[in-house]
Amino acid sequence: MTATFLVMDALALKDLPEVFDNVIDSGLLHVFSDDDRRRYVEGLATVLKPGGRLFLLCFSDQEPGTQGPRRVPKKELETAFAKRWSIESIEPSRYEVRRDLKDLSFSEGGPKIWSVVVGRPSI
């Protein structure tokens, strides 16, 4: 298996001249504003091959408090991936947080997140 790692502007994915079988987003989607999230999701659609899959982890609205990134409701994920995507799963999960970071205050067991798998339909 070959993996490609890129450092670039995630809002400029449509400018990338290559496509991939799979894309992993571990904690990026939840940092964007509504408008930027739409741009990001549109860009993701351009870099995934037909039949490709996006594996995504983002903070859940089920995580209490306000520390950390924006919380994303499940409905927002369903809406974001309603067009040009096939939602395979949106499941609750948790991030593992380093134990030595004492100033963080998240739920027992780690912050609640959504583990999402969406696919690009085959042509």
Language-model features: locations:
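Class I (Rossmann-like) S-adenosyl-L-methionine-dependent methyltransferase catalytic domain
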Residues: M1-E18, F32-I123
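Short catalytic micro-motifs in class I SAM-dependent methyltransferases
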Residues: G27-V31
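A conserved beta-strand element that flanks and buttresses the S-adenosyl-L-methionine
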Residues: I24
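Conserved acidic residues
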Residues: D21
